[in-house]
Amino acid sequence: MSISIETLEGLQRRVTVTVAADKIEAGYKEQLKGYAKNARVDGFRKGKVPHSIIEQRYGLAARQDVLSEEMQRAFFDVVIAEKINLAGRPTFTPNNYQPGQDFSFVATFEVFPEVELKGLENIEVEKPVVEITEADLDKMVDVLRKQQATFAETTEAAKADDRVTIDFVGSVDGEEFEGGKASDFVLAMGQGRMIPGFEEGIVGHKAGEQFDIDVIFPAEYHAENLKGKAAKFAITLKKVENIVLPELTEEFVKKFGSAKTVEELRVEIKKNMQRELKNALTTRVKNQVINGLLANNDIEVPSSAVAEEVDVLRQQAVQRFGGKPEMAAQLPAELFEVEAKRRVQVGLLLSSVITSNELKVDEDRVKETISELASAYEQPAEVVEYYAKNPRLTDNIRNVVLEEQAVEAVLAKAKVTEKASSFDEVMSHQG
């Protein structure tokens, strides 16, 4: 077998392979034997059909099978022998073949780039340092109380955390607009559900009052015809209700987990907060590392790998919005190409970090990660056992752990500064 490899544009390569005639003929004879064993021809018993008839009937198909198999086999022999880092599927073009002669073909394909990491020492990472305080715990307890809150009607003026029932009619330049009108609309204030200025305009008014609120729709508002427009809402305030928070009793505490006292509840809450905080900090640092790698290493990526990632993103989009799987192909590829390219680049860069640092998965850390995940459930032991019985899930955790190890390897060379931050600051800036 003779080969020649050419470098085309970018990451494209072309290999020309010639397979010796005797190898093709040997494969051809084996194919005919296979056909002969199963051929059914009138006047002959199965497996006893003369060779000349088998060749006459099946010779062309047998040659095509052999040539197709040899292209696949010979190409991947080249990939292994030449240590080609193949990306995607090759395109085969066979040359004209005459029985008894050598067979040659051309395979065109893409390769993954050879990544040489640069600028790790230029990557800047700000690492928040957070201590969960008693005030943080108090806020979280209040969140739980608000989840169990009731409301009591009042004749007092509406406050920022009250619940109100209103009728409203919105208009722009004196004309009502679609979706700007509602009756008996119940609004829990202080949750940011309405556009800026709307809830603030209700505060201070009492049930039975009618008044107008002047607001400006945000520039990024979803309705194109309302972006940045000044609007007026005519409001009828029909009911004001004060929020009534439940007392911190044993009965209240028992609604949340296994805690029996307020102190036990606070301990459980703190554990959950610590777990959420750890995940948020890990994600924030990882994102900075990845952004730094991308900024310092502008690598070319195979179009085939990007296309595969586009398909993954399409499927995820369909699943997210509850569509049917066959709808994925209808989504325009250009919607996902930027993110797909970024994902491929990130994968290649992290793989290079892993390879250059000779990183191996820390199995103890894998077990710790699974235990941490399990601790969020009522029956942690069952979750751990479930992972043990599902190798694919465990492999996913291994990939996560190895990626974390890669991030830490970059951090060891990057410029890392610590910054004192609060729990709320970190949790409000996720993503």
UniProtKB/Swiss-Prot annotation:
Localization terms from the record: Cytoplasm
Key word Chaperone present: yes
Domain of life assignment: Bacteria
Listed EC numbers: 5.2.1.8
Location, primary (coarse class): cytoplasm
A UniProt-annotated Pfam family: Trigger_C
Entry keyword set: Cell cycle, Cell division, Chaperone, Cytoplasm, Isomerase, Rotamase
Listed transmembrane segments: none
Recorded GO MF terms: peptidyl-prolyl cis-trans isomerase activity; protein folding chaperone; ribosome binding
Catalysis: reaction(s): [protein]-peptidylproline (omega=180) = [protein]-peptidylproline (omega=0)
Listed GO CC annotations: cytoplasm
Xref: InterPro entries: PPIase_dom_sf (IPR046357), PPIase_FKBP_dom (IPR001179), Trig_fac (IPR005215), Trigger_fac_C (IPR008880), Trigger_fac_C_sf (IPR037041), Trigger_fac_ribosome-bd_bac (IPR008881), Trigger_fac_ribosome-bd_sf (IPR036611), Trigger_fact/SurA_dom_sf (IPR027304)
Domain called PPIase FKBP-type: residue spans: 161-246
One biological process term in Gene Ontology: chaperone-mediated protein folding
NCBIfam families per record: tig (TIGR00115)
Family per record: Belongs to the FKBP-type PPIase family. Tig subfamily.
Functional note: Involved in protein export. Acts as a chaperone by maintaining the newly synthesized protein in an open conformation. Functions as a peptidyl-prolyl cis-trans isomerase.
Free-text note on domains in this protein's UniProt record: Consists of 3 domains; the N-terminus binds the ribosome, the middle domain has PPIase activity, while the C-terminus has intrinsic chaperone activity on its own.
Protein name: Trigger factor
Primary gene name: tig
